[in-house]
Amino acid sequence: MAKAAVTKRHHFMIQKLLILLSYGYTNGLDDAHSLRCNLTIKDPTSADLPWCDVKCSVDEITILHLNNINKTMTSGDPGKMANATGKCLTQPLNDLCQELRDKVSNTKVDTHKTNGYPHLQVTMIYPQSQGQTPSATWEFNISDSYFFTFYTENMSWRSANDESGVIMNKWKDDGDLVQQLKYFIPQCRQKIDEFLKQSKEKPRSTSRSPSITQLTSTSPLPPPSHSTSKKGFISVGLIFISLLFAFAFAM
């Protein structure tokens, strides 16, 4: 029992380390503005309680916040472009919440890991496309135990480990879910890109890398088709070096 607990804590530490380093990787590639949406699916114990919560932001400024009870858009940015972007995303997000709720409720997981009904945290990151094919990254975290990522640029999936891969393979075979993830950005791309361009023209506040406790989802590695800068190579190298130290510490 004690050994199993240590192993679980060790695995969780590695996952959080990967999150922190991958955050540094994506921030180091360029200074482009990006849209970030965080979705949380919780135990739907009552129809009167929020089981889905969504927040979308650009440069840490919230442009949309909704849940399954209050399905209307609220914005922290009073600009017309922010409102237009949020309104365009509202219905796709409501639809995706329902799809993800059905998906996670039908997903069989190890109850010793999830401790009850599995909760799902999803992070979508979309950098300004600059005329290129729009590509988004979808990061999935089930109960802080199963992690996998979907890249719309090349329609590829990556899991953090074999256990996560079992669940990931079932999700990737769901055509309806894949289509929703793939076309989430394209259906609002014009408004999103216009808003990101508008944001780029404004002075950008200096942001700090989040602490490990603030991070809720993981991206194991950047997609192989992405171009890699020197900062990217350094971050990837740090990931592998840190993992080597972590495994050596556990032995």
Swiss-Prot record:
Topology of the protein relative to the lipid bilayer: Lipid-anchor; GPI-anchor
InterPro entries cross-referenced by the UniProt entry: MHC_class-I_related, MHC_I-like_Ag-recog_sf, MHC_I/II-like_Ag-recog, RAE-1
Gene3D superfamilies documented for this protein: MHC class I-like antigen recognition-like
Region feature (Disordered): 196-228
Top-rank lineage group of the source organism: Eukaryota
Sorted UniProt keywords: Cell membrane, Disulfide bond, Glycoprotein, GPI-anchor, Lipoprotein, Membrane, Signal
Function: Acts as a ligand for KLRK1.
Record's protein name: Retinoic acid early-inducible protein 1-epsilon
Organism for this UniProt entry: Mus musculus (Mouse)
Gene name linked to the record: Raet1e
